[in-house]
């Protein structure tokens, strides 16, 4: 009975939700009372056939499969969430030490990255600094070349004007050049000391006097210092003999030498070479034997503690003597100990292109060696650009004696000293130049000469005398050459 009541209640509820629901009661064939109710389908106007029933069942199966797939996907997501929750739970339950270790690892990684960035920054800064230095060096070289170009242009213009004047027959009359010219003579007043081109044109005819040059009582070089050493006056210079040619552009001009007073372990064969093209000249190449020098195999390379200037260096009694770059200071560098033993500023000496030889190259201060010792050739404002000679103490570089000549330094290409006498060369680029002046420190007298001198390669940037070998050493446009000489008897 309760089941019947529940059935009736369900029918009533369904009937309340559907207008087509009907409740009927009737006796069956056996006389029992039966209650029935019917509800109209909301989407079907009539009962489906058997095929339609199967289609509906298939639709239900598809829906069931879809729901099952959704359920599996939901289960997978729930599983993933459970795994994540488990990891979070483990992380929360981990001790502070584990967390600290993880943080330390991360911090170490960040530090390594920071160090790498700082290293890259330093490398970039160093590269930038190098570029700035190279730029400064190039600008300095550019300024120097522009200055030389301006000087050459002025000299060319002056030479052209002087040639035109000479062509018009306005040249002053030449006088007897065998006599010394007093500083205050009338003939001297006819010369313009500031016109370099004129002096070069007339250098083979007469000396060029400068005011306040010759002293009334010039110091005399003691003959006892010379002794019987075969000294005499230069009368002949032979043809150049080429020993070696520089391999690179840095060998355009330079200086090479041997020690006329060698000290152990060096011998009279030991040769030194310095390429002087560049802004920071520090390398000195040493060759134990002449054959090594000719073949280009140095036995040692010195690195100077300070850059040298131009081509005026010499080696004497085991030390290299050179002008410090950008200064009027002469430096003595002892080769055996590779240390600086003495430095001396030459009072009033021009430097950095103030009073160079005619070829330029910052050749303001030129060191030289002869039978009597160590010399320095330079000029000063007081001498108005005329060559000044000073005898140097080879130990401490103190100036022992000084002579002022009447030869304009910028009017000659180079100079060397033999037996206490200064000799100058007329041109660095003419194939047929001359040794055109001589100044005797023993008498204080200068005179013109005309001894042929060959510039085979037409760019002689260095000429020095070696008293031990009685030869001239020269650097002529990448080529290292020697000249035999002859001296007359005194």
From Swiss-Prot:
User: What is said about its interaction partners and assembly?
Assistant: Homodimer (via N-terminus). Can also form higher oligomers. Interacts with OLFM3, FN1, NRCAM, GLDN and NFASC. Interacts (via N-terminus) with MYL2. Interacts with SFRP1, FRZB, FZD7, FZD10, FZD1 and WIF1; regulates Wnt signaling. Interacts with SNTA1; regulates muscle hypertrophy. Interacts with ERBB2 and ERBB3; activates ERBB2-ERBB3 signaling pathway. Interacts with SNCG; affects its secretion and its aggregation.
**Which key words tag this protein in UniProt?**
Calcium, Cell projection, Cilium, Coiled coil, Cytoplasmic vesicle, Disulfide bond, Endoplasmic reticulum, Extracellular matrix, Glycoprotein, Golgi apparatus, Lipoprotein, Membrane, Metal-binding, Mitochondrion, Mitochondrion inner membrane, Mitochondrion outer membrane, Palmitate, Secreted, Signal
Kindly provide the PTM information from the record: Palmitoylated.
Task: Please state the span of the N-terminal signal peptide per the UniProt entry.
Answer: 1-18
Under which name does UniProt file this protein? Myocilin
Instruction: Kindly list the GO molecular function terms attached to this UniProt entry.
Output: fibronectin binding; frizzled binding; metal ion binding; myosin light chain binding; receptor tyrosine kinase binding
- Where in this protein would one find the motif Microbody targeting signal, according to its record? 488-490
The record's function comment reads: Secreted glycoprotein regulating the activation of different signaling pathways in adjacent cells to control different processes including cell adhesion, cell-matrix adhesion, cytoskeleton organization and cell migration. Promotes substrate adhesion, spreading and formation of focal contacts. Negatively regulates cell-matrix adhesion and stress fiber assembly through Rho protein signal transduction. Modulates the organization of actin cytoskeleton by stimulating the formation of stress fibers through interactions with components of Wnt signaling pathways.
Q: Which gene encodes it?
A: MYOC
The Olfactomedin-like domain is annotated at: 230-489
Provenance organism: Oryctolagus cuniculus (Rabbit)
Tissue expression per record: Detected in eye aqueous humor (at protein level).
**Mind telling me which GO cellular component terms the entry cites?**
cilium; collagen-containing extracellular matrix; cytoplasmic vesicle; endoplasmic reticulum; extracellular exosome; extracellular space; Golgi apparatus; mitochondrial inner membrane
Q: List the disulfide bonds.
A: 231-419
UniProt record, GO biological process: bone development; clustering of voltage-gated sodium channels; ERBB2-ERBB3 signaling pathway; myelination in peripheral nervous system; negative regulation of cell-matrix adhesion; negative regulation of Rho protein signal transduction; negative regulation of stress fiber assembly; neuron projection development
Protein localization: Secreted; Golgi apparatus; Cytoplasmic vesicle; Secreted, Extracellular space
Locate the coiled-coil region(s) and give their ranges.
Answer: 55-170
Q: What InterPro entries does this protein map onto?
A: Olfac-like_dom, Olfactomedin-like_domain
Where on this chain does Ca(2+) bind? Answer: 366, 414-415, 463-464
Region span, Disordered: 168-187
What residues correspond to the site Cleavage? Answer: 212-213
Q: What is its main location?
A: secreted
């Amino acid at each position: 009975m309760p089941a019947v009541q529940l059935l009736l209640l369900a029918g009533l509820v369904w009937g309340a939700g559907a207008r087509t629901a009907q409740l009927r009661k009737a006796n069956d064939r056996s006389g029992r009372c039966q209650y029935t109710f019917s509800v109209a389908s909301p989407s079907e106007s009539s009962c489906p056939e058997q095929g339609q029933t199967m289609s509906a069942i298939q639709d239900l199966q598809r829906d069931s499969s879809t729901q099952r797939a959704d359920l599996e996907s939901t289960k997978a997501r729930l599983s993933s969430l459970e795994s994540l929750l488990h990891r979070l739970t483990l992380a929360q339950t981990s001790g502070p030490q584990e967390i600290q270790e993880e943080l330390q690892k991360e911090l170490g990684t960040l530090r390594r990255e920071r160090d790498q960035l700082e290293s890259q920054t330093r490398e970039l800064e160093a590269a930038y600094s190098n570029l700035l230095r190279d730029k400064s060096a190039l600008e300095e070289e550019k300024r120097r070349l522009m200055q030389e170009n301006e000087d050459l242009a002025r000299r060319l213009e002056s030479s052209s004007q002087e040639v035109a004047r000479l062509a018009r027959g306005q040249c002053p009359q030449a006088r007897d050049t065998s006599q010394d010219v007093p500083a205050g003579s009338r003939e001297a007043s006819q010369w313009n000391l500031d016109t370099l081109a004129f002096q070069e044109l007339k250098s083979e005819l007469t000396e060029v006097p400068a005011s306040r040059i010759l002293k009334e009582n010039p110091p005399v070089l003691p003959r006892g210092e010379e002794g019987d050493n075969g000294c005499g006056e230069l009368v002949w210079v032979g043809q150049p003999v080429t020993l070696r040619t520089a391999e690179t552009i840095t060998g355009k001009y330079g200086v090479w030498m041997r020690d006329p007073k060698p000290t152990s372990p060096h011998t009279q064969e030991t040769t030194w070479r310095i390429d002087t093209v560049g802004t920071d000249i520090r390398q000195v190449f040493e060759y134990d034997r002449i054959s090594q020098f000719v073949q280009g195999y140095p036995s040692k390379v010195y690195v100077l503690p300070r850059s040298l200037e131009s081509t005026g260096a010499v080696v004497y009694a085991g030390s290299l003597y050179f002008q410090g770059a950008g200064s009027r200071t002469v430096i003595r560098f002892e080769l055996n100990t590779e240390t600086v033993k003495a430095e001396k500023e030459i009072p009033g000496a021009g430097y950095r292109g103030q009073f160079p030889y005619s070829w330029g190259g910052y050749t303001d201060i030129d060191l030289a060696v002869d039978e009597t010792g160590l010399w320095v050739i330079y000029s000063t404002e007081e001498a108005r650009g005329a060559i000044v000679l000073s005898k140097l103490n080879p130990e401490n570089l103190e100036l022992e004696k000084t002579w002022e000549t009447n030869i304009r330094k910028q009017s000659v290409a180079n100079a060397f000293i033999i037996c206490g006498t200064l000799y100058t060369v007329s041109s660095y680029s003419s194939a047929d130049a001359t040794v055109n002046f001589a100044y005797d420190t023993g008498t204080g007298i200068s005179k013109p000469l005309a001894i042929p001198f060959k510039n085979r390669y037409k760019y002689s940037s260095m000429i020095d005398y070696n008293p031990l070998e009685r030869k001239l050493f020269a650097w002529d446009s990448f080529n290292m050459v020697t000249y035999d000489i002859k001296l007359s008897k005194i």
